[in-house]
């Protein structure tokens, strides 16, 4: 199966929300303090539409959205890798690599550092982030609504 990485369109909003909620349920993160309770979930095509903010989706050959990730503004020098999720069937097939590469390439145009937050039980994701040069930090760069995400990473761009 081949996958296309492209910018989100309005028609993708509901599909992206389903991908994110499916993954959050899988990891027991379907509660407040995670992306589960984000008020903008399902409106990404509207939210990620300004300079320094962008969201990409991974689409399979049938047109199904199987993953996504975004870059969002935190400070003038620091962005956040946001809402990076892939459905189980799309994992191990290079989809996350291609999403990450698109996000980091974009982030380098506007920022000096990239921050992210994740859950302690998402160990495979943590290894993935470390492979891309992210390193753990003790404190959040800024306070986000994701207070349940206890693991924080930073990367120099």
PLM feature spans:
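Acetyl-CoA-dependent GNAT
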Residues: 3, 7-82, 87-88, 100-102, ...
């Amino acid at each position: 199966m081949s996958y296309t990485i492209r910018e989100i369109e309005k028609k993708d909003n509901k599909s992206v929300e389903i991908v994110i909620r499916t993954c959050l349920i899988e990891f027991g993160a379907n509660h407040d303090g995670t992306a589960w309770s984000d008020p903008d979930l399902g409106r990404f095509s509207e939210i990620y539409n300004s300079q320094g903010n962008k969201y990409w989706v991974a689409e399979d050959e049938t047109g199904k959205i199987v993953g996504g990730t975004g870059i969002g503004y935190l400070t003038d020098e620091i962005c956040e890798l946001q809402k990076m999720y892939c459905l189980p069937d799309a994992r191990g097939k290079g989809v996350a690599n291609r999403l990450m590469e698109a996000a980091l390439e974009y982030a380098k145009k506007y920022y000096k550092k990239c921050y992210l937050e994740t859950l302690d039980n998402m160990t495979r994701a943590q290894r993935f982030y470390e492979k891309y040069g992210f390193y753990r930090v003790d404190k959040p760069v800024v306070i986000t609504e994701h207070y349940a995400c206890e693991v924080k990473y930073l990367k120099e761009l």
